[in-house]
Each structure stands twice: as C-alpha cells, then as structure tokens.
C-alpha cells in the first residue's frame, strides 16, 4: 500500500511538471545535468517578449541566408535586453544565433552602439556551443564590463569543450578579484558549473566541497545545483548518495524538476534498480517516449543486463519507440543477441539483415557464439549455413565454433558430405583444425553404423597430430560442441 501511495504521489508531481513544460522538445533538450542558469529552465518566465518571438520566427525563415538575416535585423533595430531575449529564444539554433550575434557585434564596432555585458555573455555561450573557444575567449577580453554572467559564460564554454583546467583556473581568477575594484562576485550559477565540472571528472569529494562552500557563503542552491550533484553521483556510481540527494529535494525547499526525474530514471537504469526505474518511467513516460531516446536506450540496456522474466517483451516494446533511423550500431547488436538467447530466429535474422544492410561489422566472439547457439538449439542447420556465408561476405569475424556447430548439426542429420565440406570451408578461411574438430568427426562417425573406416581415418589423423583420444563406442550419441 505504501509503495502504491508513493507511486501515485510521484505521478501527480510529474504530471504538474509536464503541464508546466508544455512538452516542448527543443526546450526540454536543455534539461541536462549541466544546466547552470535559471534562465535555461523551461519554468523560467522570460517576461513574454512578443517582439523577440516574432523576430525569431522571421529569422528562422531565412536561417540559411545570412544576407536576409541581416536585412531582417536591420529593419527591427533590436538591442539590449530585447536582443538578449532574442538570443535566448534562438538557443536551439546555434549557427543562426552566431549570425545574429555577429550582426550585433558589427553594429557595435561600426555604429558606436556598445554591447552590454549580457550580450557578450550570450555571444561567449554561443561560441562555446559551436566549439569555438578562441572566439569565446576573445569576446571575454573584448567585454569592458566583466560581470558575473560574463565569467559564467566563459566557464561554461570551457566546461562544454572539456577544458576543465581552464574552467577551474578562471574561477580562481574570478574569486580572487572580489577584493578589487570590480563588484562582481560568483553566483549560484558559478558554483553550479564547478559542481558539474567535478562531477564529470568523478571527483566526488571536490564536488561536495564546492556544495559545502556554497552553503557556507549563504548562497541558496537552486534545482540545477542539486541536479548537477545527482549527475555527479551517477557518474561515480554512488547510488545511495544519488537517492539521498533526490529525497533531500523532495523534502526541502528546492523541489525536483522534470530534469531531476529524468536524471533519477537514468540513475536507476544504470544501477539496475528495475523496480524504481519502472516507477520513475511510468511517471515521465509521456515525455520520455517522445523526447528521450538516450533514456530509452539506457532502459533497454538495464533489461538486457537483468534476469527479468519479462525482459524480452519489455525490450521489444521500448525498441519500437526509437525510430529505425536513430538506431545505433550497438543497439542492433544488442537486440540481435537478445533474440538469439530467446531463440526467436525470425526477429534475430531481421536484425542480422538490417545490420548487414547498414554495413555493420561484428568482431565480437560472444555475439557470434550466441547466434550460432540459437541456430543449434533450433536445429536450423541450413539457416546456419546461410548465415555463415552472409557473415563472411559482410566481413564479420569468422570463428571455429561456427564451423563446429555446422559439423555437429550436419552429423546429427547424417549429412556426411556436407559435414566434410565444412572442413574445406575452414581451410579457405585459414581456420585450422583443432583437436575438438577431429573429436566431433570421430563421435559423428562412431555413432553411425557402417562408418568404421572413417573412424579409423580420423583416429589416424589425431595420432598424427599428437592428440590423445579414447575411441568412442558406436552406441554413443553425437555430443554437443
């Protein structure tokens, strides 16, 4: 009963969040563990700048034509807070954002309309997202008024480009200037960036130290602070602290956001806690099914690693939510292996066909053994023979176990000619005969009346190669690989 009440309560909370978020895919893509500022939250109220929204729609129509973009901007003469709002709304289109920012920067240089610190901060952020760190640094130096938002923007640019040392050093420089003439001081967003930085580096003690410092400075943490802590614990596989942080949010002043629940879903999937994962998924199912392919992939992996009795059905259901064009190579291989272990030859061969069509190559023994074992258990020797030929043509790794499976299956059906042809195929693939290869031949012939001369031939070959063996009795059945 308690579990049912927890689930109902959770679904109720998430439903409210989904209503607030309006289900916008482009907005919710910003809900990563590394969001630093409140303005990047879908719950942030921008003031309803209709002018910026209308201008954004005009610019989107001409986003592939820099000349027309400039013409639209010239007609509207936008700057200051309205320009910052426009760049905020253009965030899902970084290339267009860069064109718009370049226009504003040129206006400042040519027409003497100085840019504000917030405009520079947006430009630095855009450059960071486009992996142009040099431009981001140039804009930082160009900004005469280095406010907290300007420092945060460059720290964020360093962070998203993997320049952790530069990010850390910039914070130290920023922090050391508090006693100088500048009145700018680190904000909660500054510390959020540091928490995210140390979380990515799996430096949990430093991450927690930054959070403690934040509290000692009486700076109130926000949802991004806790989300970045949770993300750090997920990186470090510290599931207890992940869950403790989540519960502290539920019981505290800063309540979980949709981003928090998505993080917890990932954490439960990674930890293999299927019960909690399924509860969390049901709560955010509508959003996840539409927008979160990576989370769906994480859940598929969680079921794959588990011994859940209904895992095949659940994996099949989840995989249908991913568009075929979005399938990653590893997902084809995982699904191939899942259906192989379930002896579902039709589904397995369907994914084999797709993998070959897409030019994927398998070089892993485990996957090949799973496929061969599935054909073996289903006694589908002709299908296995066809698969061997197709796998070879596709450049997949050929192993001795594949040919051993063919030999055993042909032998069990007394198709001796085809069984012996397998030996020739092995030679063509430069796969040598092992003791096991000869043992398979010996047992097949010994189990068949009238094949004593073949038994003697194989026994002679084994002695020639120095293999010890016991002559099997004729009554023995053909044994497995």
From Swiss-Prot:
Record keyword Repeat present: yes
GO function terms (MF aspect): mRNA binding
PPR repeats: 147-181, 187-221, 222-256, 257-287, 292-324, 328-362, 364-398, 399-433, 434-469
InterPro entries: Pentatricopeptide_rpt, PPR5-like, TPR-like_helical_dom_sf
Keywords: Repeat
The family this protein is said to belong to: Belongs to the PPR family. P subfamily.
PANTHER family attached to this UniProt entry: EXPRESSED PROTEIN, OS05G0407900 PROTEIN
Name the record gives this protein: Pentatricopeptide repeat-containing protein At2g48000
Provenance organism: Arabidopsis thaliana (Mouse-ear cress)
